[in-house]
Amino acid sequence: MADQLTDDQISEFKEAFSLFDKDGDGCITTKELGTVMRSLGQNPTEAELQDMINEVDADGNGTIDFPEPLNLMARKMKDTDSEEELKEAFRVFDKDQNGFISAAELRHVMTNLGEKLTDEEVDEMIREADVDGDGQINYEEFVKVMMAK
């Protein structure tokens, strides 16, 4: 199933994986997953974290090793409930819940994920997604960017 992903998608997932894999050992533990989830304002229980790991953990070793998320991502990208996941992701970015992602909100989330971006990089990300040119990203623009990945 992972063979349905493009090289670009695989390298993006590898980059995302490394944001979770804090110690760089090639495995994501429940502790590392919890750290990232909490940095995004979520508060999962240990059992929820273990369930998330189990959903992806193909070899049953209790952690997520890199190739494992690829099959999950290929499945998720085909899922019809991705609409709800997109709405949830948008809500994570849209801190003040005004229906728009501002440069400050984008910078905040990316910083929490460990991505130190310059103002220029954040502005460039906004510009790429900002179809109507109002300087922020609305839900429709967000969906376009996420579906284009």
UniProtKB/Swiss-Prot annotation:
EF-hand domain: residues covered: 8-43, 44-79, 81-116, 117-149
UniProt-listed Gene3D superfamilies: EF-hand
Annotated InterPro entries: CALM/Myosin/TropC-like, EF-hand-dom_pair, EF_Hand_1_Ca_BS, EF_hand_dom
Cleavable signal peptide: none
UniProt-listed Pfam families: EF-hand_7
SUPFAM superfamilies: EF-hand
Species of origin: Malus domestica (Apple)
MF terms (GO), sorted A to Z: calcium ion binding
UniProt family annotation: Belongs to the calmodulin family.
Protein name: Calmodulin
Residue sites binding Ca(2+) 1 per the record: 21, 23, 25, 27, 32
